UniProtKB/Swiss-Prot annotation:
Annotated organism of origin: Klebsiella pneumoniae subsp. pneumoniae (strain ATCC 700721 / MGH 78578)
One Gene Ontology CC term in the entry: plasma membrane
GO term, biological process aspect, one: 4-amino-4-deoxy-alpha-L-arabinopyranosyl undecaprenyl phosphate biosynthetic process
Main location: membrane
Protein localization: Cell inner membrane
Gene (UniProt): arnC
Pathway assigned to this chain's UniProt record: Glycolipid biosynthesis; 4-amino-4-deoxy-alpha-L-arabinose undecaprenyl phosphate biosynthesis; 4-amino-4-deoxy-alpha-L-arabinose undecaprenyl phosphate from UDP-4-deoxy-4-formamido-beta-L-arabinose and undecaprenyl phosphate: step 1/2; Bacterial outer membrane biogenesis; lipopolysaccharide biosynthesis
UniProt KW Metal-binding keyword: no
EC number: 2.4.2.53
Protein name: Undecaprenyl-phosphate 4-deoxy-4-formamido-L-arabinose transferase
Catalysis performed (reactions): UDP-4-deoxy-4-formamido-beta-L-arabinose + di-trans,octa-cis-undecaprenyl phosphate = 4-deoxy-4-formamido-alpha-L-arabinopyranosyl di-trans,octa-cis-undecaprenyl phosphate + UDP
Length: 327
């Protein structure tokens, strides 16, 4: 079995978007959890274009004497996964842990992820126990997880939980990928030799509301589908062929019924023809929408614009020099 050197430094990456209410508690609990590790650590918080006071609070936390906080400030909102990738580009640890800022995944679980990674795993995922989300979110999450498992063939139980640990070589491999639409847990698993999941607690959200609106969830679903595989395009071709065969068979049926019963049956077939027409139009719009998603993402990749723009990085002088040496 492939072995890795002991983890000397842990980097915790946390995307932040309008989380000023939860930041003091997040910083306190995360720092306390990391202090129990008995090894070096840093806490990178990426401000994803917040409109509240989050950026100022992160800057002050990073500038405080003896702070382990690194503040990465983006110029605007790019989305959770792009913000995490921005954090990945500035980590100095050899084990990287991602964590949400809403405290629904307790920072106190960090030592358990580090201990599991020490057993020789490239990726340590988590499965939320007693999940404190709405029925809609739970149902959507189960459907997406099943879709991912069927498509990738990897039986990971909870791809939606961002409390995860990654070895440094996994992070470097992901940073070498240049697609604009990225879903980090899936991308990481494509590079992992050994991956495992552990159960973790899931708490109710104490501060603010979820930053994932219905439209953001829809966009995330499209990211999942299009970044995984081109299978939907093949299914679209199969679906179109089935519709064409059904249309041909139904056309023959209409001819037979007309010959048997005359033009008077079913209002001379007007309603049935409308039903068939709407079925075909609906199928065409589904196909066009799916093709449009793929073409739009190809267009974004061809433009080769950066997936994020870092406006400022605030860190302690000694850690800044180490980060420059690594670069």
């Amino acid at each position: 079995m492939l072995t890795y050197p002991p983890v000397k430094k842990v980097s915790v990456v946390i995307p932040v978007y309008n989380e000023q209410d939860s930041l003091p508690e997040l910083l306190r609990r995360t720092d306390a959890a990391c202090a129990t590790l008995g090894r070096q650590y840093e806490i990178l918080l990426i401000d994803d274009g917040s409109s509240d006071d989050s950026a100022r609070m992160l800057t002050e936390a990073a500038e405080a004497e003896g702070s382990h906080v690194v503040a990465v400030l983006l110029n605007r909102n790019y989305g959770q996964h792009s913000a995490i990738m921005a954090g990945f580009s500035h980590v100095t640890g050899d084990l990287i842990i991602t964590l949400d800022a809403d405290l629904q995944n307790p920072p106190e679980e960090i030592p358990r992820l580090v201990a599991k990674a020490d057993e020789g795993y490239d990726v340590v995922g988590t499965v939320r126990q007693n999940r404190q989300d709405s029925i809609f979110r739970k149902t959507a999450s189960k459907m997406i997880n099943r879709l991912i498992q069927r498509t990738t063939g990897k039986a990971m139980g909870d791809y939606g939980c961002m409390l995860r640990a990654y070895r440094r070589h996994i992070i470097d491999a992901m940073l070498n990928c240049h697609e604009r639409s990225t879903f980090i847990p899936i991308l990481a698993n494509t590079f992992a030799r050994r991956a495992v999941e552990i159960p973790v607690m899931h708490a109710e959200r104490e501060f603010g509301d979820s930053k994932y609106s219905f439209m953001r969830l829809i966009n995330l679903m499209y990211d999942l589908v299009t970044c995984l595989t081109t299978t939907p395009l093949r299914l679209l071709s199969i679906f179109g062929s089935v519709i064409a065969l059904l249309g041909f068979a139904f056309g023959l049926l209409l001819v037979v019924l007309r010959l048997a019963f005359g033009p008077q049956w079913a209002a001379e077939g007007v309603f049935m023809l409308f039903a068939v027409l709407f079925m075909f139009i609906g199928a065409q719009f589904v196909g066009m929408g799916l093709l449009g998603e793929y073409i739009g993402r190809i267009y974004n990749d061809v433009r080769a614009r950066p997936r994020y723009f870092i406006q400022r990085v605030v860190r302690q002088p000694e850690t800044a020099s180490k980060e420059e040496d690594r670069s």
